[in-house]
């Protein structure tokens, strides 16, 4: 289902994998406390990198707010910019892997 060489890990919380048909799969990583192993849950399948990037930034910012890593509008603005830039760089790496 996935092309193993075309995968990027984002913030140890999300993973993006390229499917055989070229679509992009957004996967949430979690920890099974009983089995003590990492679990993967597919959140969504995308054809558009822009829609995927938008959702990834949104999920990572929400995660930071939930974990109280940010507490002001200025911090929110700064974090959103940093995450968008970080994700764009990772997408470039993913595209390099896809075209390899």
Curated annotation (Swiss-Prot):
For this entry, the protein name equals Uncharacterized 11.3 kDa protein in GpA 5'region
Known InterPro entries for this protein?
A: DUF5405 (IPR035404)
Which gene is annotated as encoding this protein in its UniProt record?
ORF81
Q: Which Pfam families match?
A: DUF5405 (PF17399)
Originating organism: Escherichia phage P2
